[in-house]
Amino acid sequence: HTWLPDAGVAPTTVTALLHAAVLVKIGVYAYARLFLYTFKIPAAWQQAVIIMAVISSLIAAAGAVVENDIKRILAYSTISQIGYIFLGLSVANPTAVSGSLLYILMHGLAKAGLFLCAGIVIHSTNKRDIREMGGLIRTMPMTAISFLICAFSVIGLPPLGGFFSKLLVIMGAIKANQIWVAALALFTAILTMYYLMRVFSLVFLGELKVSAPEKTPSMVGVVTVLALFSVLAGFFVSYPMKLVQLATTHITWWLR
């Protein structure tokens, strides 16, 4: 909550997306490998991790709500979504764990698309403050549509990939009788929708403040492909779910 927003803003967009979409998942992998597969953590510790995961998601989402730097908003969003992943792992039943593992993939696709869209916008406008932008959907339609699709996946709207993974996490919390956890997870999803739609509205809708043409096909093509993958991952979610269920079976062996 202190260093990651700065780490997401300072480097180039490509470095930031690798960090947000891939490198931050290393801690998730280590937790799953050590405390779900190798050791069985005490129930009190498990509940403590659940509480920290919920608080982490809420605080980071609140930070994204009040931030105006587009890359910093996405960095706060990464913290919030990692909290979501840890939430499913800490609930530690097969449904929630499956949702967390699936969301590692879905978040990676969508967040990479969001960071690259932000990079295209910054490269075209030379601005990072979303209050200084506006109306870019007129000049950058493909970037705008790709950003919107990836945002919908992170929010968890059907039929995109993020919907199924977040649904599994929430269902897992309910099965574990953690109703308050499921309720706060839903509230975090609402905050996620608010700050990402705020970014889309201020950057791409409204009055055109900065004339910024669409970038090269190679740049726009990458974000379009990531947005397309986010859609296909939702329609064909059964394919990654086969691997997720296999991994879940091994990780949660001690529950059987």
Model-derived segments and spans:
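Hydrophobic transmembrane alpha-helices and their helix-loop junctions in integral membrane proteins
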Residues: 1-202, 207
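Cytoplasmic/organellar membrane-interface segments at the starts of transmembrane helices
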Residues: 140-143, 193-256
